[in-house]
């Protein structure tokens, strides 16, 4: 995940949820790189007021008190996030199992997802985060943060997992 913060108010919280623009520049395998397969870079909508405040507070960029509104205005509507979405390989250690210890209200077993990032995917993420930083720098972001993998996001694990015993 890469986020660029800009001096100018962009109104980046306006627009559709999810991916607004995406790039497939790095989607195919490039044999000159250290990883196989590729990833998309997705331009997302900026955060709304609550997420902006919580995120700025988390990174110690926002203080509650006398100058809160001015300080908040320095953050709100001024950021553009990019998501790096990798194409994993199916791997035996990733799997979906029935979870008999956690049942639903009808007594049916729940689902347990066992997933671990491969070294190849870690290399892809690293490459994507670097490209995202370059994009934000070229776009004129005054500050850039990168982090990942982001745990509670839209991971699509079915294609990388195995269900069953055979």
What are these regions (language model features)?
Residues 1-78:
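Mid-to-C-terminal "cap/lid" subdomains and adjacent gly/pro-rich loops that border
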Residues 77-88, 93, 108-166:
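A glycine-rich dinucleotide-binding beta-alpha-beta segment and adjacent secondary-structure elements
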């Amino acid at each position: 995940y890469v986020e660029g913060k800009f001096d100018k108010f962009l109104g980046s919280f306006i627009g559709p949820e999810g991916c607004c623009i995406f790039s497939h520049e790095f989607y195919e395998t490039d044999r000159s790189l250290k990883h196989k397969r590729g990833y998309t870079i997705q331009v997302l909508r900026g955060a709304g007021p609550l997420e902006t405040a919580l995120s700025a507070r988390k990174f110690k960029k926002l203080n509650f008190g006398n100058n809160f509104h001015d300080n908040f205005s320095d953050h709100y509507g001024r950021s553009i996030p990019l998501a790096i979405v990798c194409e994993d390989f199916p791997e035996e250690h990733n799997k979906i199992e029935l979870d008999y210890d956690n049942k639903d209200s009808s007594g049916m077993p729940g689902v347990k997802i066992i997933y671990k990032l491969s070294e190849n995917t870690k290399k892809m993420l690293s490459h994507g985060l670097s490209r995202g930083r370059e994009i934000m720098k070229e776009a004129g972001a005054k500050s850039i943060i990168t982090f990942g993998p982001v745990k509670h996001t839209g991971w699509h694990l079915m294609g990388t997992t195995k269900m069953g015993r055979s």
